[in-house]
């Protein structure tokens, strides 16, 4: 018996060694293929083991990439470790060559999302992506978005009441966390029809789960030892991720079941149809393909989870960095405030039509997105070869990183790129600009389907903030840019808030 077990152990050890060797061989062949594909693109020197990972994980890494754009025009290889290599692009014609096509997302990055958000619009490709995109597009029509203005305002006012108390202490405080709570509450109301009216999420298992999943997913992407699924699910970090995933899925599944049951009841269905607005789940349950088939429960959950994931973090980043820019440039802050006051006049609240009138605020917001794009990088895998404007090319299977932050600060595209100048986005200055020079919501057929929703929310939130408070920076706690799934700050965004009095906000 002992001899049999000993032989079995030897066989198992041998099998593990063989599998490990085959895995290593596969990785080496992949590296060789990627390196050969990018042979015509010079780039910064790499570490023998970590590639460029040590450089891009340092504080100030975003601005390091910007300096590389001056050394290596158009694009350069970017190695994350020895086996994952992207062509990092930051020039409009290069961006157009890839992102005008609709290639799938790079699995080396986006496969980490699957356990939580499933195969929703973010990670789907091919005919099913096209089908879902077509089905979901009516959900972002302006007739659907109009009633959301009141929801945006309600959640914002709750946050502003909290800020009123904090501002009275006379200290600067980090706004990022509060904006995140408000954005998630807003999204829950727009998705499920209800949120947390007090923005106090300690008892909300769904809020805790979504917040934790976002953090854990970023930590996994940043940690090489967690990239292997088998190893990751055995770690405490992986088990924590699975628990949070289960909590989020249980909540979404429960709401879907309840809503489906309500739609079977004639009276309940009539109540839903007579509400002030349809939420995102209502719309998903109502859509049908050309054959009349509805989305499956699996597809429903994937699209809801995708909407929650994409919707709250990006707007949190956009709003927080915009308020920082307003604090940094008080003359633009005041001009935006005056514009909003003039638009509101004697009204008690914003109307849908008011949003289009916020022209200067919109220009300031776009300039903020140029300098601080909510999503600093997006990734693709080429489904077919691509040829670039300078004659260089890449084969199918190559990985692409579009570095939006570097593109938006490329001095060949933007004169004086570090200067905050909202007039870059005036109609006369925008006319004739390359369509891929400014792409805060990505670009092409796979651009952000919810960009109008996000812009509307950010306009309402920031306008109400500017009416209630005057913002100024804390010179001792300036934000340190941290590129993750969205653009964050390593030390938060600390601002001083000065209440403008009860008559400032209508």
UniProtKB/Swiss-Prot annotation:
Provide the positions where the record notes the PTM Phosphoserine: 431
| Conditions for induction | P450 can be induced to high levels in liver and other tissues by various foreign compounds, including drugs, pesticides, and carcinogens.
Q: Which reaction does it catalyse?
A: an organic molecule + reduced [NADPH--hemoprotein reductase] + O2 = an alcohol + oxidized [NADPH--hemoprotein reductase] + H2O + H(+)
Coiled coil ranges (UniProt) are none
Cytoplasm as a keyword?
no
Q: Name one Pfam family in it.
A: p450
Question: Cross-referenced InterPro entries, in alphabetical order?
Answer: Cyt_P450, Cyt_P450_CS, Cyt_P450_E_grp-I, Cyt_P450_sf, Cytochrome_P450_Monoox
Q: Per the entry, which co-factors are needed? A: heme
Query: Record's GO cellular component, any one?
Result: endoplasmic reticulum membrane
What is the predominant subcellular site recorded for this chain?
endoplasmic reticulum
The protein's Enzyme Commission number: 1.14.14.1
**Is Cell cycle there in the keyword field?**
no
Please list the GO terms describing molecular function.
Answer: heme binding; iron ion binding; oxidoreductase activity, acting on paired donors, with incorporation or reduction of molecular oxygen, reduced flavin or flavoprotein as one donor, and incorporation of one atom of oxygen
**Domain of life the protein comes from:** Eukaryota
Extract the SUPFAM superfamilies matched here: Cytochrome P450
Annotated keywords: Endoplasmic reticulum, Heme, Iron, Membrane, Metal-binding, Microsome, Monooxygenase, Oxidoreductase, Phosphoprotein
How the protein sits in the membrane? Peripheral membrane protein
Tell me where in or outside the cell this protein is found: Endoplasmic reticulum membrane; Microsome membrane
Q: Which family does it belong to?
A: Belongs to the cytochrome P450 family.
Physiological role: Cytochromes P450 are a group of heme-thiolate monooxygenases. In liver microsomes, this enzyme is involved in an NADPH-dependent electron transport pathway. It oxidizes a variety of structurally unrelated compounds, including steroids, fatty acids, and xenobiotics.
Name by which UniProt lists this protein: Cytochrome P450 4B1
Protein's organism: Oryctolagus cuniculus
Gene name as annotated: CYP4B1
């Amino acid at each position: 018996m002992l001899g049999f077990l000993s032989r079995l152990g030897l066989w198992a050890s041998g099998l593990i060694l063989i599998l490990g060797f085959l895995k290593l061989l596969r990785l080496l062949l992949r590296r060789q293929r990627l390196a050969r594909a990018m042979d015509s693109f010079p780039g910064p020197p790499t570490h023998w083991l970590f590639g460029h990972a040590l450089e891009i994980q340092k504080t100030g890494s975003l601005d390091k990439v910007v300096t590389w754009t001056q050394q290596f025009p158009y694009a350069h290889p970017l190695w994350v470790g020895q086996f994952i290599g992207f062509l990092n692009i930051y020039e409009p014609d290069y961006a157009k060559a890839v992102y005008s096509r609709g290639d799938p997302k790079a699995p080396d990055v986006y496969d980490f999302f699957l356990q939580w958000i499933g195969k929703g619009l973010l990670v789907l490709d091919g005919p099913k992506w096209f089908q879902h995109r077509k089905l979901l597009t009516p959900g972002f029509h302006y007739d659907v978005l109009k009633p959301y203005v009141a929801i945006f305002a309600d959640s914002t006012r709750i946050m502003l009441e909290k800020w009123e108390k904090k501002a009275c202490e006379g200290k600067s405080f980090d706004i990022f966390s509060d904006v995140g709570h408000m954005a998630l509450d807003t999204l829950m109301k727009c998705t499920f029809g209800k949120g947390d009216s007090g923005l106090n999420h300690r008892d909300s298992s769904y809020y805790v789960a979504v917040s934790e999943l976002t953090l854990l997913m970023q930590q996994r992407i940043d940690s090489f030892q967690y990239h292997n699924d088998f190893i990751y699910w055995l770690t405490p970090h992986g088990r924590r991720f699975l628990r949070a995933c289960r909590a989020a899925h249980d909540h979404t599944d429960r709401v879907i079941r309840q809503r489906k049951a309500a739609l079977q009841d004639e009276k309940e269905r009539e109540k839903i149809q007579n509400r002030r607005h349809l939420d995102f789940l209502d719309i998903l349950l109502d859509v049908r393909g050309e054959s009349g088939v509805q989305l499956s429960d699996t597809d429903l959950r994937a699209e809801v989870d995708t909407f929650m994931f994409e919707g709250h973090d990006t707007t949190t980043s956009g709003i927080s960095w915009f308020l920082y820019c307003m604090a940094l440039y008080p003359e633009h802050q005041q001009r935006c405030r005056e514009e909003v006051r003039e638009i509101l006049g004697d009204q008690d609240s914003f109307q849908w039509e008011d949003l289009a009138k916020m022209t200067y605020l919109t220009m300031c917001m776009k300039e903020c997105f140029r300098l601080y794009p909510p999503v600093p990088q997006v990734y693709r895998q080429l489904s077919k070869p691509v040829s670039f404007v300078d004659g260089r090319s890449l084969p199918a299977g190559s990985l692409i990183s579009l570095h939006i932050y570097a593109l938006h600060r490329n001095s060949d595209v933007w004169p004086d790129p570090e200067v905050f100048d909202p007039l870059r986005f005036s109609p006369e200055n925008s006319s004739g600009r390359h369509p891929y020079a400014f792409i805060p919501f990505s670009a092409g057929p796979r651009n952000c389907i919810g960009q109008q929703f996000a812009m509307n929310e950010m306009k309402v939130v920031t306008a109400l903030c500017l009416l209630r408070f005057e913002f100024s920076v804390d010179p001792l706690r300036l934000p340190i840019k941290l590129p993750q799934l969205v653009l964050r700050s390593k030390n938060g965004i600390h601002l001083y808030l000065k209440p403008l009095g009860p008559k400032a906000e209508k």
